[in-house]
Amino acid sequence: MRHTWLAEKNVIRFFGDPEPIQKNYHVPDFSADIGNLPVKASVHIQCGVALEDAVIETEFIQAQSNAHGLANAIIAFCDLTQEDAQAQLDAHQMFPNVRGVRQIVGRDAVEDARNGTNALLENTKFKDGLITLSARNLSFDLQLTPPLIAAAAELFKSIEDVPVAICHAGSPQDFTKDGMRDWQAGLKDFAEHGNMICKISGFGMFDHDWTVDSIREKVLRVIDIFTPARIAFGSNFPVDKLTASYADTMGAFLKITQDFSSHERDDMFYNVAKDFYRI
C-alpha cells in the first residue's frame, strides 16, 4: 500500500513540512496520542493512498479496527469520475466499517491546480458518481477551499439526498477581513443544504501558530451558522500533530465551547459524528 505523499522528500505541503509525520501511523500510535482522554470511537478518513491501492487501504483499516477496536467507521477514497467507480465502491463496501467516500475537491490553490482536483465540480462524471452514493447508503466527505464553496454549494444542494460532511470547516486560509467575510458567506450557503454537517478541525494546517484565542471566533461563527446539532469536532491527526498535541487540540475546543449546554456539547463532541457515520 503506497501513500505517495509519505515517500516525497523535501516537499513542503500546504500544511507545512510533513517530514515529522512521514511514517506509519497505526491505531497504537493514535491511542498513544489520545492518552487518557475519553475517546469512545474514531473515524478514518482516506489519507492520500495511491489510486490503485484505495481498496487495499480500506482492507488495512478494517483489519486495524478488528484488531484494536478503532477506527469504527471508514471514509474511503474513490475517484468518482472513473469508469470503474462503481466496481471500486462495490469492493469498498465488502468491508463493514465503510460509511462513505472522500474525493478531495480542494486543499490549496497551488496543489489543486497541479492535481486538477479544482476541476471536479465542473465534471459531470463527478456529479453522476455522487448521485449513486445515496442508493448505496454512503455519505460524502467534502474537503475544499473557500473559493470553491459557491460552486460546491450549488452542486450539492441539487443532490440533497446525499449526506455531506464538510471537512475542516471549509478550510479557511485567508484571515483578512474580506477573506473571513467570504468564508462565512460560503458556510451560510452550505447550511441551506438540508443533509449536511460541518466538522471543525484542521486549523493547524493554515495557522501554524494557532492559539485558543486565535481560533475562538472562527469556531463560534461556524457553530452559529450550523447550530450544535450539525457540528462535529475532529482531530485531523496525525496532520495537526505538527502544530499541537491531541490533548491541546481537544482542550482548545472544549474551552471554547464551555458556555454551551451539556446537551449541545454532547452533540458536537459525540452525537453528531456518531449519527452521521452510523457508529
Question: Model-derived features: where do they sit?
Answer:
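Catalytic pocket-lining loop regions of alpha/beta-barrel enzymes
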Residues: W5, G116-A232
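Catalytic metal-binding/acid-base residues of hydrolase active sites
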Residues: G48, D79, G170, F203-G204, ...
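Alpha-helical scaffolding within the catalytic cores
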Residues: Q22-S31, A85-A87, A150, D178-L187
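Conserved, mostly hydrophobic/aromatic
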Residues: S42, I74, V101, L133, ...
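Active-site gating/metal-coordination segments in enzymes
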Residues: E52-P147, E154, I197-F206, D213
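Mid-to-C-terminal alpha-helical segments outside catalytic/metal-binding sites
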Residues: L6-L37, A41, L220-R221, I225-A232, ...
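Active-site gating loops and adjacent loop-to-helix segments of metal-dependent hydrolytic enzymes
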Residues: R2-V43, F95-T117, V162-P163, G194-I197, ...
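A generic "structured core" feature
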Residues: M1, G35, G116, T124-K125, ...
